[in-house]
Amino acid sequence: MYHAKTLLFYVHDWKKFPELEALYHQIYEKIPKERVQKKTVAGMGKSLQAFLSNLQVSHLHDVPIRLHLANKDFASGFYKKVHIAREPFRLVLKSLVEQGLMEFQPGFKTFTKDELFFSPETGEEDKHYGRLSRIWPTDRLRTMLDKLDW
């Protein structure tokens, strides 16, 4: 799925998404928590809320969400500022993909000066295509979101 237009992953105010609460609990119960530290399990809730709100926005606007997955973004960047830890975030991401609720397209490594990438849409050189990972809801999650009371 290639879209020239994407939205950046954002930590929305969870209170603005009350309709997602039941879906949140349903999905949270299915996330594997065995052999995971208590601190990591505690952070999974906030990460899941962030993913669900972004997937809902992606569903409503029909565009993928791009997100940073570099360690530096968790250590001193955006995620650190909004108190989202790397390990719970990645475990929730993996679980959503395994549950068949989210599509995930990993980003490409940063390009060097000599590397080129060709856009699948235009066929022209594009050094900026795909640097960030992208997520969007699967048809299964879209069906679940459509059934919610808005």
Regions found by a protein language model. Name each.
Residues 1-44, 50-150:
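Electropositive, intrinsically flexible nucleic-acid-contacting patches
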